[in-house]
């Protein structure tokens, strides 16, 4: 549907969702979250199981989602959660110089990845348009309305972690995350 640039227009629309938090974001504006894996989105758009895919431009391009769903509306968000996890005991066994290499390379990789998200998104949008797709930006004013309607997901996560006995660690992560995303 071409009418996807307002929160009001998304009300009642079936939007591809996943996990515990994204459905809360969709419910907050009256949309209907539908769990669909990325590899099933093409067919879900084709059959009308979903109205919108809620995937980044790179995935829209690589999965050719502009074929069953000509209109791409966004970007409302990008998920950037790629990481390498090392257990505390293993980390403690590594020599300090190796730990420093890991930390240095992690910082470099993070910056390169975030820079790539910007350039990669632009390239994908250009390619979607060349293939006949239409990319419509979701206005900042509408995104602000969506954010205002959405519950504080980070607080919800921290509260859940506190119930599991990790309150101080969760508070530290939440504080760092809020500072990083300002």
Task: Indicate residue ranges for each PLM-predicted region.
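N-terminal secretory/targeting leader peptides
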Residues: 1-182
């Amino acid at each position: 549907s071409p009418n996807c640039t307002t929160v009001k227009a998304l009300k009642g629309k079936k939007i591809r969702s996943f996990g515990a938090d994204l459905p809360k974001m969709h419910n907050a504006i009256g949309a209907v979250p539908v769990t669909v894996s990325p590899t099933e989105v093409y067919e879900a758009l084709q059959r009308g199981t979903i109205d919108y895919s809620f995937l980044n431009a790179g995935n829209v391009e690589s999965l050719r989602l502009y074929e069953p769903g000509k209109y791409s509306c966004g970007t409302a968000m990008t998920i950037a959660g790629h990481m390498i996890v090392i257990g505390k005991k293993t980390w403690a066994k590594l020599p300090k110089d190796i730990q420093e290499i890991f930390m240095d390379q992690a910082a470099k990789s993070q910056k390169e990845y975030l820079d790539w998200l910007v350039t990669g998104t632009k390239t994908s949008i250009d390619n979607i348009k060349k293939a006949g797709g239409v990319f419509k930006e979701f206005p900042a004013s509408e995104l602000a309305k969506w954010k205002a309607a959405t519950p504080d997901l980070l607080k919800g996560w921290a509260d859940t972690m506190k119930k599991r006995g990790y309150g101080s660690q969760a508070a530290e992560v939440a504080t760092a995350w809020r500072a990083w995303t300002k």
